[in-house]
A protein has these predicted regions:
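Entry/N-cap segments of selected transmembrane alpha helices
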Residues: 13-20, 77-108, 190, 240-241, ...
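Core mid-bundle transmembrane helix pairs that form the ion/substrate translocation pathway
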Residues: 18, 22, 27, 160, ...
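Short, hydrophobic transmembrane alpha-helix segments
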Residues: 23-33, 50-56
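Structural signature of hydrophobic alpha-helical transmembrane segments
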Residues: 27-43, 62-65, 88-99, 120-125, ...
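Hydrophobic transmembrane alpha-helices of secondary-active transporters
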Residues: 42-87, 220-227, 236-264
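Cytoplasmic-side transmembrane-helix entry/capping segments in multi-pass membrane proteins
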Residues: 58-70, 89-91, 115-126, 148-153, ...
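Alpha-helical membrane segments and immediately flanking helix-loop junctions
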Residues: 113-153, 294-322
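Membrane-embedded alpha-helical segments of transport systems
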Residues: 129-132, 148-169, 279
Length: 322
């Protein structure tokens, strides 16, 4: 399995992704499009996939990028973060209520107006990451095509709209610290962080903790950093490469979809996404009464998108990704 993943890196299907993604990212950046290194590749690969171009995102490449992303976010973890755990109780409670309301409202809409069956409507309405929901939907013998298409269209909308909202409400962008000497760091710390990350990813995956690649790396980074065993700051420029791969991976998910299939689900997916976003904004506003957190960070927290995509947006705009 691992050998197959490595071989895919050298196939024309993946090389094609890189060939079309880099120019699209550079062009998007030239025109100052928010989150250019994500949106450019995402849009171009989506169009390419729907046009019939054979493209693929090897799981091993995506996994590597998610570990890098986890190490980036790990720099935000310190003792002060754990002092805020009381606040998490309130936001977690609000999140639970938000998810329940989202599923009830959107599922009912999809059943009534889009003729979705009950199980398909529930999995399509859930504001979570596509991967885990697809696994649950498959176990329940649900229409995977409806669930996947609904979430992919939603992800495209969310990831396209959110950067424009953020950039119009903050002056921050990807922060580049030119004064920091990356080469002067103890590079052994990076090796320790990677080894610890791989260990906890394996453990978290075995005990079925969601998003093991990210959560395992975060746990390892936080543990080693708080205990002063190891810490390491990756160059901020690597965020752009993470953005490019994540954006391309979203587009590659359309490889097995048809334009007709997307068109048939587009209208209802747009309506469902609008409902989820409105409910998310309400939840974020309610959360401001319980926690002292940037409203944009809360909006991202209650955004009905994938955890990896939302986390990388937080990093790109210097918002608290935890």
């Amino acid at each position: 399995m691992m050998l197959k993943q490595i071989i895919q890196i050298f196939t024309i299907k993946f090389i094609s992704v890189l060939i079309i993604s880099f120019p699209s990212a550079i062009i998007a950046d030239y025109f100052n499009i928010p989150l250019a290194w994500f949106l450019g590749p995402m849009i171009v690969t989506s169009i390419a996939a729907l046009s019939g171009l054979k493209i693929i995102m090897p799981k091993i490449v995506l996994s590597f990028i998610l570990i890098i992303l986890g190490l980036h976010i790990g720099n935000y973890i310190d003792q002060n973060l754990f002092n805020q755990m009381l606040d998490w109780i309130w936001t977690s409670l609000i999140m639970l209520i938000y998810i329940i309301i989202c599923i009830l409202v959107v599922a009912k809409y999809l059943q009534k107006f889009a003729s979705y069956r009950e199980k398909a409507s529930i999995f399509s309405a859930a504001p979570g990451a596509l991967g885990p929901l697809m696994i649950l939907a498959e176990n329940e013998k649900t229409d995977l095509s409806q669930v996947a298409t609904s979430h992919l269209i939603r992800l495209i909308i969310i990831i396209t709209v959110i950067p424009f909202i953020v950039v119009n409400n903050t002056d921050s962008n990807v922060l580049l610290n030119d004064d920091f000497s990356y080469l002067a760091q103890n590079h052994l710390n990076l090796i320790l962080l990677i080894i610890a990350s791989l260990f906890f990813i394996f453990v978290f995956d075995k005990i079925r903790i969601p998003a093991a690649l990210l959560s395992g790396t975060l746990f390892a980074s936080g543990l080693l950093q708080i205990t002063d065993i190891a810490s390491y700051k990756l160059p901020d420029e690597t965020v752009n490469f993470c953005l490019l791969i994540l954006g391309s991976s979203v587009g590659c998910r359309f490889a097995e979809k048809t334009v007709k299939e997307i068109a048939n689900n587009s209208l209802h997916s747009i309506v469902a996404t609008t409902i989820l976003v409105v409910l998310g904004l309400v939840a974020a506003y309610v959360a401001t009464f319980f926690v002292e957190t940037n409203i944009l960070t809360l909006i991202l927290s209650f955004s009905p998108g994938g955890i990896y995509e939302v986390a990388v947006i937080a990093i790109a705009f210097d918002l608290d990704p935890d």
